[in-house]
Amino acid sequence: RLVANGPTNQLVTWLNDPAAQDPAIAGGKGSALARMTEKGMPVPDGFVVTSGAFLMSASFQLLQALTPILRASATDTDAIGEASEHAMAAIASSPINPMLIDAISEAYKTMGGDAVSVRSSATAEDMADASFAGQYDSFLNILTFDNMVQGVRDVWASLYSTRAIAYRIQSGVPNSSVGMAVVVQRQIHPDASGVMFTRDPVTGANRFVVSAALGLGEGVVAGEAPADRVELDPNTGAAIKTEVVSKDAMVAALPEGSTSRVGVPEWRRLQPALGERSLVRLSELARQLEAMFGGPQDIEFAVVDEEVHLLQSRPITTLDDVEPTDATEWDGWVDPKFSWAQSFLGVFAGPVYQLQLDVADAFSDGMRQCFEETGAERTRNHIMTLVNDFVYVRVPEIDADVLAGG
């Protein structure tokens, strides 16, 4: 593991330097990685091009371009688009200070000049009420110093993309107060990668939910690769539910740099992306991250030879919209005159998702309409009902004599 070299440079700082734990210096992603590094968690080595370096590189043309942004509303798409174009052009055309080039070069050489990832880390991101996930650009498998510097410049420019400007306005984050740090880390070449939520982001249930694909994690984040889904007991790490899909594609690093979506050999497609050892380790780290950051986390990870590497941890921002519910009593939800069964013919075998509920509702409504048209009037819960996220279906009654006879 690399160590911080002397006093913190105002332009570049290492992830294991205490100064990098300040979001005002290293941005949201960088400061979280620095805190994880301090605790000895498996974070790839790296350094941060600080928000101060970004401010030093800001040109007069950029400052001019920001003026209309400060007056725009989230729905003023024309004004936002024009301001975005001018701001990004100003960043692309402004020379980078030679002092910063030297600082980045020294850090890059210290890391050995190997392949790196260049990732955004804005000073206002990954907050409890606004994640900014996907708003800024990041670049993987950068092989040369010049391309890395260009990646830093492109990350800066993404701070002023139309979607980022509009999202900040919508989230109440002043465009005048946000800066951009850049995290440069040693590139991991994983067997599998993915995301892990320490609460179900849809239902708020207390379980760990893992989505994992083969290759690089962009396959999961961008939806470019099929992903397995595993639900884990948060206390033991034991699998509650596992869905292994056919993974015919993945995102992989290319020998010439950058990444691409590639095919997966047929023999590997139905193998689980993650082994039991990796899932247990992920659960251990997830519990530590929840304790460290004080709440449910959205975690990005990569796995090499079943060893887990942490790439990011941020608060889950969707839970405020989830209303936790107590266990539903049977009374009032099912007609006691009939028999009911869960997992009828294998349909709705586990806790259901909202899309499945919508399908079930339409199915139930259609059946009820058929009964009404044939004169067999029935209420909605004569056919199908939902109790504690499980679908129950009415089944044929069994004569008591049959039950008594075994």
Set out the residue ranges of the language-model regions.
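N-terminal beta-alpha lobe that positions the nucleotide/phosphoryl donor
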Residues: 1-183, 192, 268-278, 282-294, ...
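Conserved divalent-metal-coordinating catalytic cores
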Residues: 1-39, 45, 49-58, 78, ...
